[in-house]
Amino acid sequence: ITYLKVTTAETPYLIREPEEVVMTQEQETAFINNCLNSDRSLMLIATLDGKHIGNCSFNPVGNYKRYRHRCEVAIALYQEFCGYGIGKIMLETVLKAAKESGFEQAELEVISDNQNAIALYEKLGFQKYGTFPDNMKYADEHYASADWMMKKL
């Protein structure tokens, strides 16, 4: 929970504000246990010296048969650890596991001006397939668009 509060505070690219991280320890534990007990979801945790520094996950897109081939991918990493290849390793691992779980395509949403993330996603084979204008509205009243990206597994 502390990790979520820190990552949401240090970057404008995540969907929540720090004060919106309101889950209890029990709720977070239940969420993690659901990931551990599912063959259709994965949460990969990156640690350094026993401290949580990042995570990467995949989850099904809905629970419909016609969507069974699709998964959503998400990643977050403390800013101080960006640029060292940790995110790339986590994404490669998660994408491999998603394919092994039977998914045929991975999807994600990224803020359009997050060029470092977009460059990484493109390096891993993701392609942009659309833009959602004014996807997020910040406290200072400005908006950010988001790109939708997809990769065949």
Write out the residue ranges for each language-model feature.
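Conserved catalytic-core motifs of GNAT/GCN5-like acyltransferases
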Residues: 60, 107-110, 122-142
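Conserved beta-strand segments that form the floor/walls of ligand-binding pockets within enzyme
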Residues: 45, 57, 72-76, 85, ...
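C-terminal "cap" of GNAT-fold acetyltransferases
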Residues: 71, 111-118, 134-153
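Acetyl-CoA-dependent GNAT
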Residues: 8, 20-80, 91-92, 152-153
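Conserved GNAT acetyl-CoA-binding A-motif
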Residues: 91, 98-109
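A short, well-structured alpha-helix characteristic of acyl/acetyltransferase catalytic modules
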Residues: 1-22
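Structural preference for long, well-ordered alpha-helical segments within the folded cores
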Residues: 89, 93, 97, 119-123
